[in-house]
Regions:
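Short, aromatic-enriched amphipathic alpha-helices that serve as compact interaction elements
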Residues: 16-34
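Bacterial Sec-dependent N-terminal signal peptides
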Residues: 1-22
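Short beta-strand edge/turn micro-motifs at domain boundaries
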Residues: 109-145
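Sec-exported extracytoplasmic/periplasmic mature domains
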Residues: 28, 32, 40, 44, ...
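Second-shell loop/turn segments in exported
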Residues: 22-25, 50-57
């Protein structure tokens, strides 16, 4: 019985690790399409980013795609990395992934650094096809460093 629990934990962390690596890749490549694939399809995602972006609102996954397309058109990522190897456990079936995002304005080369928090939740698929639901972004918050 303990081995089943351990296997479940290892599988959960493995899937979570794949998600966090995909988030890192989306930011490094300034790729709103990849980020869009990681956003929850169940409801709206809350996004709150301080200056220089200065935005806070709930939006659909499609709106988030267009929002990040505009962000990546204005700013270029030059550093994005996780603050810790494992995400912080928020509650059952959800985690907070904390990362440092450094980016610069493409027009004037002003550099900015934010601490970004991604709330990740397990999203149940509509059918019974996937035994382990994927981790999806339900919230993105940031604060200046």
């Amino acid at each position: 019985m303990a081995s089943i629990g351990f296997f479940s934990l290892v599988l959960t962390l493995s899937l979570l690790s794949q998600t966090t690596r995909s988030i890192e890749k989306a930011f490094f490549q300034d790729d709103p399409r990849l980020l869009y694939t990681l956003i929850s399809r169940q409801g709206h995602v809350y996004i709150s980013l301080p200056d220089p972006i200065s935005f806070s609102d709930q939006m659909s996954p499609e709106q988030a795609y267009f929002f990040f397309r505009q962000v990546y058109a204005t700013y270029s990522t030059f550093e994005f990395y996780a603050d810790s190897e494992l995400p912080v456990l928020a509650k059952e079936n959800s985690f907070i992934f904390k990362a440092r995002w450094s980016f610069k304005n493409k027009k004037n080369d002003n550099q900015h650094v934010l601490q970004v928090f991604f709330h990740l939740a397990r999203e149940k698929p509509p059918g019974r096809g996937i035994p382990q639901p994927p981790w999806r972004i339900t919230e993105i918050k940031a604060e200046p460093l």
